[in-house]
Amino acid sequence: MAKPLTDSERQKQISVRGIAGLGDVAEVRKSFNRHLHFTLVKDRNVATPRDYFFALAHTVRDHLVGRWIRTQQHYYERDPKRIYYLSLEFYMGRTLQNTMVNLGLQTACDEATYQLGLDLEELEEIEEDAGLGNGGLGRLAACFLDSMATLGLAAYGYGIRYEFGIFNQKIVNGWQVEEADDWLRYGNPWEKARPEYMLPVHFYGRVEHTPDGVLWLDTQVVLAMPYDTPVPGYKNNTVNTMRLWSAKAPNDFKLKDFNVGDYIEAVLDRNLAENISRVLYPNDNFFEGKELRLKQEYFVVAATLQDIIRRFKSSRFGCRDPVRTCFETFPDKVAIQLNDTHPALSIPELMRILVDVEKVDWDKAWEITKKTCAYTNHTVLPEALERWPVSMFEKLLPRHLEIIYAINQRHLDHVAALFPGDVDRLRRMSVIEEGDCKRINMAHLCVIGSHAVNGVARIHSEIVKQSVFKDFYELEPEKFQNKTNGITPRRWLLLCNPGLAEIIVERIGEGFLTDLSQLKKLLSLVDDEAFIRDVAKVKQENKLKFSAQLEKEYKVKINPASMFDVHVKRIHEYKRQLLNCLHIITLYNRIKKDPAKAFVPRTVMIGGKAAPGYHMAKMIIKLVTSIGDVVNHDPVVGDRLRVIFLENYRVSLAEKVIPAADLSQQISTAGTEASGTGNMKFMLNGALTIGTMDGANVEMAEEAGEENLFIFGMRVEDVEALDQKGYNAREFYERLPELRQAVDQISSGFFSPKDPDCFKDVVNMLMYHDRFKVFADYEAYIQCQAQVDRLYRNSKEWTKKVIRNIACSGKFSSDRTITEYAREIWGVEPSDLQIPPPNLPKD
């Protein structure tokens, strides 16, 4: 008779090792069937395509969870330094295909769905984008998570689980109309709620100073409920966690006010607390000082820091003493990266916890805080910098205001000692801005409270040092770094452009997918006839596929032999979609003037969302659609010029349009685009760039050779010189007849016959207060576009430049970016250790 099992032996049977993985197609089919019937409770007679998508998602998720659990066990045992990436935005897009790619499951799932009479691509299209971001900043966070997992870093993304992400954009009569993005309506198969880790977050209240320390009393409490999403690395069995917080009212919310006789009212008012995580603020590069937004910023910070400290205290080697109350080793075990100033409250909040709660003395606490935090700056536009009214802090976060005052006082004392009598320097460097309304400058707080400050492209990091934080750079030059942005080659090549990935793998193997610098090997193939043919063929296939999609979605017929000229990004004056518009009009006028001439046919695609309150951006969209209405219906033009506004541009649409693009427009005024990452995606996918010397364009030109991009326009120095001299738009308007004609057409109502005054604000801005100097670059831009046309006529030479660009895009992998953060800011080394898969023993 078998000896009875001990409790511990019985418990050992509860193990991920006991669960079969998805080895083959038959397994996938079996698991799919099981989920359709047992998870979704449907049979084939009533199942909808959405049910089939969910069944497949659960099937793929099953393959993740064993690795996810294993990864977390592995971190607990090894106790590495943990990286916490704090961001108010994570623009993840869809998850299914990315998970299949990173786990190497795509072939098995493709075959299994085919055998079940389903089309994998159709199922993938059912998934909602997780649109928890506005644009570049949120998408960067998503790429970074992918790279951190692929590099085996013990990293966590922390943010907010917005119930409504970035709005869906509809175009109605040429105008943008916003619709709520109810992305969770059908449920989210990738997230796991973790109510056992729910944490309280405090607001309002008052501060009391006692002999035993400082108390923050009479606060309103909101609960933060974590939802975890797995983040798989590429084929390394590492699965990290993105933890997003959702706001919940406590059960006694408003009921503890004994004077509230209305129980129903009190329960209904729970919504007020839960509104904190209701919706993403749709502003890109613009600060709108709303109290709800400040609440969101503190909410994510307060919940996350409690979580970080809980994990630090319970980690195996978190501290030397048994009760783990010593925070000496905190910066050796924890790195906090602030994605812009939005999570800046991490600095005073960590101070509050250390000083008020953990009773660490101020100077020690400040040293710990500085060593732990690092800050990434993402913009130089003054209207984007966060400057919160002191009065709002006083009410919402009274203790944090005191702490910020104390931080500022010590900081200013230090500056005054180094620069005696320089009162203006003190004013410039203060965290508190005096004036009609006292404000807190969050960027200054971040610089003071961090051990590293970085810009996101070399030119931007120079501007940060020479201009934005000049005084701070003089104080602590060693603190400032550059970390040029990057993109994940898994999503932005392998997933979105399998045709291109395949012909590259055939030539140089697949090592480039985790070491993108290997693309350099393609340089030897620049003159290889077969490779030139293959690259051109893949591009043509992508264009045909995208054309078919456009026809299906928007009912527009386009010429797939035309040059696909693509300008997709948030709509903003500094990104200069208006410069593109002027080129389109100029091209149109040239065709009309000389219709017999042979023009290179173009399809110009412009896409992007405008912040709902940004009047000029909305006018720009209306102008693009109005130009399209005229150009696309002019029989003289035919299919030589088409203008398409790509509605509801988002991650999943980017994955379709970028592989089909011939020309990538990156035309911001020099010195305004911190880096840009769309530029990198186009480069990697075989489009050529027309752009200014701004952001990462500068480094792209350096990597590929300036002669392999179409660079035009003012450099940063020229823009500064023009500012000194005084920019006079009228000068250019008078001197350039084609520009004058285009502007006059806009202002006379040529593109808005039913409302001739429609664009008067746009013309008035361009003529009298254009901060971004559109006219100053018009002439150079038009000439540069003519060069584009000339090269495009010679398909072979064009494709050779494409190959050179792809071969030189290796620097722009987020793996390279994250490796630099790891070594130079966080003090950790990437690891190529393969965690054993769940069906094998740990060692």
Swiss-Prot record:
Site (May be involved in allosteric control): Y156
List of residues that carry N-acetylalanine: A2
Keywords: Acetylation, Allosteric enzyme, Carbohydrate metabolism, Glycogen metabolism, Glycosyltransferase, Phosphoprotein, Pyridoxal phosphate, Transferase
Modified residues (N6-(pyridoxal phosphate)lysine): K681
Pfam families in alphabetical order: Phosphorylase
Activation/inhibition comment: Activity of phosphorylase is controlled both by allosteric means (through the non-covalent binding of metabolites) and by covalent modification. Thus AMP allosterically activates, whereas ATP, ADP, and glucose-6-phosphate allosterically inhibit, phosphorylase B.
Cofactor(s) required for function per UniProt: pyridoxal 5'-phosphate
Residues found modified as Phosphoserine: S15, S524
Cleaved signal peptide residues: none
EC number, UniProt record: 2.4.1.1
Keyword Phosphoprotein in annotation: yes
Binding positions (pyridoxal 5'-phosphate): K569
Site residues, Involved in the association of subunits: C109, C143
Residues the record lists as binding AMP: D43, Y197, R310
Family of the protein in this entry: Belongs to the glycogen phosphorylase family.
Functional note: Glycogen phosphorylase that regulates glycogen mobilization. Phosphorylase is an important allosteric enzyme in carbohydrate metabolism. Enzymes from different sources differ in their regulatory mechanisms and in their natural substrates. However, all known phosphorylases share catalytic and structural properties.
Cited PANTHER family: GLYCOGEN PHOSPHORYLASE, GLYCOGEN PHOSPHORYLASE, BRAIN FORM
Protein's name in the database: Glycogen phosphorylase, brain form
